[in-house]
Amino acid sequence: MGGEDAAPQPVELVLAALVGCEQATAAYVARHTRPRFPLRYVHFDLRATRDERGAIALPIDERPPVSSRLLRVEGTAIVHLSRGAESRARVEALGRRVEERCPVADMLRASGCELDVRWQMAKDFLDDDREG
């Protein structure tokens, strides 16, 4: 629409807010899970799809026919452990709890955005990457 790519796009900032909030929420959830979840950090690889029809609809002096919004955020959350090993079930449970508690994820869902983030251990991610 404009600019010279000298700064982040607004949608990139929304994704950055989601990642930051989910990192903080994951740390909180891991700390309070029993037995404690040995979380070191989570690496996110996310992509967003947006409906631009509302933003670019003409004529400009009429209300757009649809809302301009994110339709979908998808990708992976790759969990790195501080020690030991964890079951896939516990990693997936961590992801579910984070998604349930993250305020930014909740705001996106409330706007009608579909979130499809697959939580997996770093080792699983590397194994899956080699197979694909």
Regions found by a protein language model. Give the residues of each.
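Extended beta-strand/beta-hairpin segments
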Residues: 1-16, 24-132
